[in-house]
Amino acid sequence: MSRLFSDVLPEWPLDEVEAGLASVTETDVLVALELAENGRRLNARDFMALVSPAASPYLEMMARIARDVTVRQFGRSIQLFTPLYLANYCTNQCVYCGFNTKNHIHRSMLTMDEVEAEGKVIAATGLRNILLLTGDAPKLTGPAYIAEAARRLRPYFPSIGVEVYSMSEDDYRMLVDAGVDSFTMFQETYNEELYLKLHPAGPKRDFRFRLNAPDRAARAGMRSVNVGALLGLDQWRRDAFYTGLHADWIQATYPGVDIAVSAPRMRPHEGSFNDIHPASERDLVQYIQALRLYLPAAGITLSTRERPFLRDRLIGLGITKISAGVSTAVGGHAHAAQDAAEEHDTAQFEIADDRDVDQMIAAIEAQGYQPVCKSWEPLDEAYACGKSA
């Protein structure tokens, strides 16, 4: 059987990565920046230099190069999407997540008619990219349930993504056959010892099975594969480095797949987990710019976990995809008028940017960029953000 990313990760032991980050010199950073500016391919050591403490004084130079690289690869366009939470039942005990099975929150699961109602509300905003999410409760929201939801939504959305629990390759293939074309999986942290502490019980505790999920999704025919770590669980520079390695592995191993990276930071949630390794906004900027220089063709997604000012400023510095009109509550689009207390009681985490689609479009245009509401065919409509009747 061919290699998986779980075969690659041990080649970069945690202590060696930590030592490598600490030993980066100013010269190492400048060499990496010169390579990027000249359009040369960066290797893993160059990427390590760019996420190291030694690169922090060079953010302005990184920003200039990252802006140029992004425009060359993607033009002046930003893709828009929104999440649709199908259910928040979960059997895991992730200590940092609002869906933790021990948390006393209101649990719910959409019927197929409710799924379609949510889809209609979202489609009316003009968005044609949607991301389906659930907790990890396969007995309730199994692959067949998610596939049926995708089939119900397919008439409204040319591009449907999933961010759900780890599945088998056959299950991912079932989703592809139902119309799902993109896949997102956060490893949360690449520090296996810490990962096991953060996931004391539940199927998600299987570090290796989750780690290899992007490989299985790519083999199953997903058009786009998105990986990421949740910054704040471990030292951010280590997880940033491993995320870049993971994305590069998928890109090199499955050349027909579009690779993307998300860069979420910890946000307040239901529960008591507070053992956070903070990543500042400046840290996030460094990470995103380093990703752009290391992986010029990769999409980079920024979520509503970040405040509006920062999201707007990052539009020109490497970001290619951004969420809008977000609700992290089950049924949160069709029932947006319900009171804030009920929304808070079912949400996975608190969002920092609550702008709707029209406001996000205006913000993107104010930065001199074109909002893109449809990413796939037909090509002649791909750059329109028109609303449906």
Language model features by range: what are they?
Residues S168-D177, D234-D248, R307-L317:
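Catalytic cores of alpha/beta
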Residues G39, A66, C94, L132, ...:
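Conserved, mostly hydrophobic/aromatic
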Residues G75-E114:
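Canonical Radical SAM [4Fe-4S] cluster-binding loop centered on the CxxxCxxC motif
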Residues Y58-Q79:
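Short, charged low-complexity linear segments at domain edges
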Residues T101-A217, R223-V227, L231-L233, P255-S262:
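Core AdoMet radical
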Residues F47, V51, T82-L84, L131-P143, ...:
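Glycine-rich, proline-tolerant flexible connector loops at the mouths of alpha/beta enzymes
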Residues T82, G119, I146-A150, Y172, ...:
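Generic structural signal for well-ordered alpha-helices
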Residues M1-A55, A252-A389:
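Auxiliary Fe-S-binding modules of radical SAM enzymes
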